Each structure stands twice: as C-alpha cells, then as structure tokens.
Amino acid sequence: MNEPSPSDWHLDAYDYELPPDRIAQSAVEPRDHARLLVFPDREQLWHRHFYDLPQLLRPGDLLIVNDTRVIPARLYGQKIETGVPVEVLLVEEHGPGYWLTLVKPGKRLKPGSAIAFGPNPEDPLLVADVEASDPATGGRWLRFRGEAEAFWSQLATLGEMPLPPYIHTTASDPERYQTVYSRELGAVAAPTAGLHFTPELLTTLADMGIATAPVTLHVGIGTFRSVDVEDIRQHEMHSERMMVPAATVEKIQATKAAGGRVIAVGTTSVRAIEGAAASGELKPGSDRVNLFIYPGYRWQIIDGLITNFHLPRSSLMMLVSALIGRDRLLSAYATAIAEQYRFYSFGDAMLILPDAKLP
C-alpha cells in the first residue's frame, strides 16, 4: 500500500534499539487489557486498550484468525546408549510419529541411537529412534515408537511449551500461550496477536456485526529466525503448512462485495490469506506457504492488520512496513517505546486501519 524507496531493501533499515525492560516476560491479565496502539491513515497515533476494539471496527468488517494450536514441543530425555541428557524440540510431523526435530547435543545423536523420555529411563514413557540427520536445519529425524494416540497422550504429560528465547520465565499456565479459539494442533509458536482476545470480546464483536473467519497456519521455528542478508530481496522465507477453508473464502468474498474490510489478526493470517491468493484468485485448500512480504508487495486481500511489536531486522517488520511504510512503522515503534508499551510475544498490540476514523 506504500511505494518503496531504495533504502527499504537494506536490512539495517529495519533496526531499532529496544530497552530490555520493554520485552514482556508475562502476559497481561485479563487478556484484553493489553494496550493497543492504533495506526490510522495520516493522523496522530491513538492510544487505546484491546478491549476498545469493538469501537474501532465497524459492522461488516471481517477478522481473519489463525486457529492453530501450539504443541508442548519441548521434551527432555536421555540417550539410551550413554545416559547423556538430551533436549528435543519437535518442529514438524511428517507422518504418524515421524518428526523433524532440533536436538541438543546434536553431535552426539547419530542415526541409529535412541532417546528415552520420562522420569524413569529404565521404564520410559516415550522412546524415539534417530533415523537421519537433516542438513537443511541441522536437526534430526526421529521416529517415536508406539501408537499415535499414546504418543499424543504422553506428549501432553512430558512436553513443555516452547516459549521464544527472549522470554526467560516458564509458562505457569500453558493455556496462556494459546489463543482462546485455537483448535488445530501443530504450531511450535503461538500466533501472538490473537492472544489478546477473550470469549466475551469475540461475542461483543459478533453482536455488533463484526464477523470472524478461521485459517490455519502452523507457526514453525522460522518465525524466530532473523533475516541475515543485507539486501532483503535475497532473503529466502521459511515455509509453513497452512489451510484456508472454503467457508472462509466465501466470507471474504461476501465482505468485499458488501464494502467491508478484511482485517488479519496477526502476520500468520496475512501470509495464509495472501498466499492463498498468490495466483490472483483467492482459493481454498491446504498447501505450504513461503510468501515473503516486504515493501513493494502488491496486496491482494488484506485491508488492515492487528499485530504485536516485532523484533528488529525481522521479516515480520518488513511485512508490516509493506502495509504502512517503513519510516512510519519505525516512528510508531519509537512512540511505543517512549510510551512504555510492552514488546514481542506477550506484549501489547497495534491496530493498523488505513481508513480508520476516531470513534
């Protein structure tokens, strides 16, 4: 929605200084009491709270939400052959019980070795065999023994929430790192813009004629990866599994036809919908998406965005810059820092509505 300038291609242009105490280490309670920085078109920023959202939207708007659910993907076990402690992060399942994983210490886990999980290594609750290395990620392919139902049951007992590396506390309530509408198990990180919704807020929005429609994009480890090429146009985006239901496509088409706005809740919802429309026509179905959105991108569907504050030099900052412009985004971030907003996964949010009017 904004024309790029040559400086928009430079990685350093997406850097900013964030005081460490602005990184939220826990979530606000209640969920919808997070602060909300509202970014209208060519007007002063507004400071609100997330519970003000119904007054900032209008009947006929459609919110696209990502209904992925975070798996307790971090496991601790022992190498059966030596007793060496092992940490495993489940990344993505490729068939029942067959997982791409990241492991520590990786060098000691060669194909043919096995890992036991559970309080008693002599009688483990789960056992995984190392079948292969993965050159692309440096990870390992693990096959868990036993039936799929038993695996998921034990994972719920043994697994821990894989909080981002900048959060140094543990999740006292694992559900706080899930959205209230999460349904489809498969993510290793939460779609954090959705963490601010409560059931009551969703009901209020629906009563006002502001609908929601789900997509599923299973957030992968690539979401924490920084861009590492100076010319961002050379960046290779990670791919993630996504699904756009036919009913969601129909809702989007009806909203557009009636003059309503399609507002994505989070960058993952953006990538799912815009990825499904990459051919020029929005199509339902399941696929993998590796769409990299940066300044100069021609938007197909999305009119507005709810998003948290993102890490410097990240692809997520570039996506938001494609919507409102890099200079304006950095100016908004500077305001947010000065006004003591909380940043990153458990932090506050932004509402970007190019045609918003002060309620």
Curated annotation (Swiss-Prot):
One of its GO terms (biological process) is queuosine biosynthetic process. Its main location: cytoplasm. Gene3D superfamilies: QueA-like (3.40.1780.10). It comes from the Bacteria. GO terms for molecular function: S-adenosylmethionine:tRNA ribosyltransferase-isomerase activity. The keyword Translocase does not apply. Its EC number is 2.4.99.17. Belongs to the QueA family. This is S-adenosylmethionine:tRNA ribosyltransferase-isomerase. The lineage of its organism: Bacteria, Bacillati, Cyanobacteriota, Cyanophyceae, Synechococcales. The gene is queA.
